[in-house]
Amino acid sequence: DKLSAMAAGGNLPDIIQMDYSYLQQYQQSGQLADLSQFIDSGVIDTSKIADSVIDSGSIDGTCYALSLGSNAPMMVYDKEIVEQAGVELPEQLTIEELYDIGQTIYEKTGVKTYYDGGINMMQIIARTQGSHLFDELAAGTKTASETHFANVDKFNKAESAISPDLLAEKNPDVVETKPIIDGTTWNDFSYSNQYISIANTAGRDLGITMYPTTSDATTQPMFLKPSQFFSIAETSQNKEEAAKFLDWFTNSVECNNILLAERGIP
């Protein structure tokens, strides 16, 4: 709201932290500077950045936002608990395998499974069939959502899975209260940029795998997601200096060490 008020008053700061959901809105209102000129001149070095990453912040072939890093959905797990249960996790489980392995882990250790009942898992399910969740919803198709909520119901009813009441109490959206932190669950779901924070807070060795897929998947649902963007305000009187900062933020090992990769992998 504060940024919107600043935009309306023509008082945007030189550099704006931008998100996918607002990029087109700000670009269409003429409030974002064209970054392509700084990329072409070499002020912002993109030689080691994939074209697809540049494209993620571009509209109609012009770059208006520079990705600060890339993330991927992940499942993180407690290595010691998994080893105690005598199970091995592949690089990517199916949801059915997650359920079965969760039962084994609960029987052997008493530690419960967490199933992501939110929109991220629903998006993954849609992607397993080569679709996208919001395209399905716009078309009135319910395939992904029906499959997802059937899975949510299955896990909610399982003794081996954390109950909805306890999950709400733990609040997995906050690192410090995630149920894996105190050993209530053996697994958790997040994005890869959160791994260091989760592992440090847990204070023990955690493994990482891809988000689960479905047993009938026709395509790999995993994807890279820009963590956040930086844009330069069109009203900025210091565009080149701002572009130099974006270059440092994106390419500097020093900067990434300071942030501990919190914004994603450069």
What is the predicted role of each segment?
Residues D1-K2, S21, L93-Y99, L166-I181:
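Short helix-initiation/N-cap motifs at beta->coil->alpha
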Residues D1-S29, D40-S47, G61, K170, ...:
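Conserved N-terminal structural module of periplasmic/extracytoplasmic solute-binding proteins
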Residues A7-M18, Q31-A33, V111, I181-S190:
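Alpha-to-beta junction loops
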Residues Y20-A72, E83, E96-Y99, G207-P212:
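Hinge/lid segment of periplasmic solute-binding proteins
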Residues L23-Q27, S192-D205:
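A ligand-binding cleft/hinge motif common to bilobed small-molecule-binding domains
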Residues S36-I49, E91, S131-D153, N200-T201, ...:
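Short, solvent-exposed loop/beta-turn-alpha elements that line the ligand-binding surface or hinge
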